[in-house]
């Protein structure tokens, strides 16, 4: 079994090697639109052979889903934003949470791809996520990209920035400050903004 955090090719490219594949219900529903477009773009950028992803055959998961791995029951938390159906997986037995790309992996959370939610919707999603993470705030969190475990300061200096509940809290605050124009994003194409330990990259049309 493969449990995907979201439908992007850098996470699902080898999904065809598994008999059972789980994916957020909203990602399955959005596949034929912006998510497939984002996948085609990312596959092209990485110069990978094209593949067909039979997403319609994947097992949909929601916040009510529990995955029983032989007595180790994995809890699902919905966290739309990076994709419409992004999810986190909570392993209570090993006291860890797999966050995928929902809140970044130390570097910025990427919200500029086709299918990413607008900022106000992402902020609302983060509010629900913070509440869901309260009981497991002391669990170790594993992001989706090891090579992105470092943040970067205003002058480009890198620092170790592991995914924690504090990063999610700072992301929520950052979204609010961007919407209230208390923080102005920098950049001309993709925009970037930073607050505390959180950083976000998004498009100008998402600032609403």
Show the residue positions of the predicted features.
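Flexible, active-site-proximal loop/turn residues at the rims of small-molecule/cofactor binding pockets
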Residues: 8, 27, 108-109, 113, ...
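Accessory terminal helices/loops
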Residues: 127-208
